[in-house]
Regions:
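Ribosome-associated RNA-binding proteins
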Residues: 2-4, 8-10, 14-212, 224-226
Length: 226
């Protein structure tokens, strides 16, 4: 096998060219001791951890496969983190999942009498540190949790970890876009090599666009409750 083909073989496991990961810093995280995330680390440079892009890609594929087994509306996607709000709303727009952004009211999963209560079969969170309420309620209800996790993320009640930068605007846009694309492919809504009509930049948080997404999401929630 030629060196060129070997290089091509090495790049094949990546969901998108490495340069895009680098542009978005989606594979970079602060250095922090976390034995659960250590296996995803490629190397450490100074005070930063570089996640293995191949392993990020593998976990996104695995998460997409798992999510594809659930009805879209029964997938609850959560983000209390500001830069995760637009990615979550866009992800739900293109996949049919149910979004919850901003503060996660106690009882959302555990109290059927609560306005805004959600019946979910699986929960996807943006960052376990700030989405702890959603994870705790999912645990009480025996609902599996998929989470994007950085080195400082608590993962005790996370069933499937997707390593990545959970703080950056571009990184969250790219991670959610990749997961949306792979989920649509798993469902057969896109062919294996087909690209969606939207790009990762469409998932990037912009306050003015977030307000429009939020209004649309509220309308969808009202229809679902009816």
């Amino acid at each position: 096998m030629s060196a060129k083909k070997e290089r091509e073989g090495e790049e094949a496991p990546f969901l998108i060219p490495y340069d895009v990961f680098r542009e978005c810093a989606a594979h970079i995280a602060p250095s922090f001791r976390n034995q659960h995330l250590r296996k995803f680390v490629f190397r450490m440079i100074g005070g930063q951890v570089i996640f293995d892009v191949k392993k990020i890609s593998e976990r996104i594929r695995l998460a997409a496969k798992l999510l594809s087994h659930y009805p879209p509306e029964r997938i609850l996607v959560v983000s209390a983190r500001e830069y995760g709000k637009t990615p979550v709303l866009k992800f739900c727009e293109v996949t049919g999942a149910t979004p919850r952004v901003g503060r996660f009211p106690p009882g959302t999963l555990t109290n059927p009498a609560l306005p805004g209560h959600v019946e979910a079969d699986i929960v996807l969170v943006t960052d376990p540190r700030v989405d702890a309420q959603a994870i705790e309620e999912a645990r009480k209800m025996n609902i599996p949790v998929v989470a994007f996790c950085s080195m400082e993320s608590p993962v005790q009640n996370v069933d499937l970890i997707i390593p990545g930068n959970t703080k950056g605007r571009k990184s969250l846009a790219l991670l959610y876009w990749l997961l949306a694309r792979e989920l649509l492919r798993m469902r057969g809504e896109l062919s294996e090599d087909e690209e969606p009509s939207f790009t990762w930049r469409d998932f990037e948080h912009r306050e003015e666009e977030f307000e429009l997404f939020e209004e649309a999401a509220e309308e969808v929630s009202e229809v679902q409750e009816e």
